[in-house]
């Protein structure tokens, strides 16, 4: 499938592709296979681009997941991105029964003949926003800015107890739990992990918190709040004993980033699920 890129400023075509943090080897292969065109004509990597030019890349891909017929809650879509409000109780990718399979079905119905790519992950019971990326260049771009913490990802969670401070930060490294598979722990030898939070509602037993991730470690929110004595409601793996929910209450509610093609800031919000209530 071919994807078009409207050029805004004069630039060498190779430098333009490198601006997406796309690897030199992949760029070389695009030109070697004659997949890059300018205004309808095949070009080489020495070509200069001008404002208003239409660069076209043929990615020669096909859908790589088995399609699964289910509804998608799509909150944003253009030629480069598909942002979805993920429901609970579904994993991101698997051979047959995952969000990627549902996206594959959507691609098939809409003649989007591209690999199914996601920029980040959400756990099975986490609801909310997840970015699928149609364009390989844009995936490379997002991966870079996720690593440099320039994509803003905000969450809502309900945790046990009342926190001591209305807002704060948890700056504790996270590593593997050697005794329990698929569990993380705070560890001096772990990777840097920083979680910022602010209480938005509370009662004597529970707190609803808004969370901003500075880093994106696996289970970061769940591990950090468990470590400070406030595990997420429903998160049995990390110590919740309340039995108030059959899933942990964590929702990816806002994502914002600069669009690599238009340079506009994209900001998307997903409504908080109905089961996110703490009462009086």
Predicted region positions:
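RNA pseudouridine synthases
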Residues: 1-169, 175-178, 275-279
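Short beta-strand or tight-loop elements
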Residues: 70, 114-115, 155, 166, ...
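Conserved hydrophobic positions within beta-strands
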Residues: 74, 159, 196-199, 232
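Short aromatic-glycine motifs in intrinsically disordered, low-complexity regions
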Residues: 63, 180-188
């Amino acid at each position: 499938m071919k994807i078009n890129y409207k050029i805004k400023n004069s630039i060498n075509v190779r430098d333009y592709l490198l601006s997406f943090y796309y690897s030199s080897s992949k760029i070389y292969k695009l030109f070697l296979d004659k997949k890059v065109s300018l205004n309808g004509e095949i070009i080489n990597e020495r070509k200069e681009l001008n404002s208003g030019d239409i660069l076209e890349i043929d990615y020669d891909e096909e859908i790589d997941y088995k399609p699964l017929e289910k509804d998608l809650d799509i909150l944003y879509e253009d030629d480069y991105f598909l942002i979805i409000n993920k429901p609970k109780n579904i994993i991101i990718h698997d051979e047959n029964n995952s969000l990627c399979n549902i996206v594959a079905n959507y691609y098939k119905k809409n003649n989007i003949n591209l690999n199914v790519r996601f920029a980040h992950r959400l756990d099975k019971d986490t609801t909310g926003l997840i970015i699928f990326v149609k364009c390989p260049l844009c995936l490379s771009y997002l991966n870079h800015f996720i690593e440099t913490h320039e994509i803003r990802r905000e969450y809502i969670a309900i945790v046990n107890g009342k926190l001591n401070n209305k807002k704060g930060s948890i700056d504790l490294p996270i590593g593997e739990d050697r005794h329990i598979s698929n569990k993380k722990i705070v560890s001096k030898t772990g990777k840097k992990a920083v979680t910022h939070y602010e209480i938005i509602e509370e009662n004597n037993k529970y707190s609803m918190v808004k969370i901003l991730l500075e880093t994106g470690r696996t289970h970061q929110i769940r591990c950090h709040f468990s470590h400070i004595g406030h595990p997420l409601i429903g998160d049995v793996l990390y110590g919740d004993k309340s039995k108030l929910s059959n899933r942990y209450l964590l929702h990816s509610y806002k994502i914002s980033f600069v669009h690599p093609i238009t340079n506009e800031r994209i900001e998307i919000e997903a409504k908080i699920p109905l089961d996110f209530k703490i009462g009086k």
